[in-house]
Amino acid sequence: MNLERYWAKPDKTIQQHINDLLTHLETLKTMGYIDSDDLYELVKLACYYHDIGKVTERFQQRVLAKEKQYFDPDREIPHNVLSVYFVNENQVQKIKGHDKRDYARVCFAVMYHHDYCDPIKTILEREDRIKENLAEV
């Protein structure tokens, strides 16, 4: 998926936003706050996946609208919930020294990077709407 084609914000693509986060991640590593290569790789994956749920047609229409449009809870699923469906478990498993819980850790970081909703409750109660939103991709 070419994330340069999708917008995270009106003035920034998802890929540009990811690149910004990765720059900050490098700063944290350089400063010694991330001293484990495994942790660095897990956070890097979380940075990559955290906003991919914004690729939906509804989000893209909203972010590019000339006049401010608000999130429609009847039609949309928060992007942090949708993003977790894109996390690739195989990528997590490729990390040297990975732990079987690492996939869940990355998913948790992605799901809870905003507090728009209770992600688990949303997943359990809005499965049909999640499928509709993901079908737009």
Question: What is the predicted role of each segment?
Answer:
Residues M1-V137:
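Metal-dependent phosphohydrolase cores
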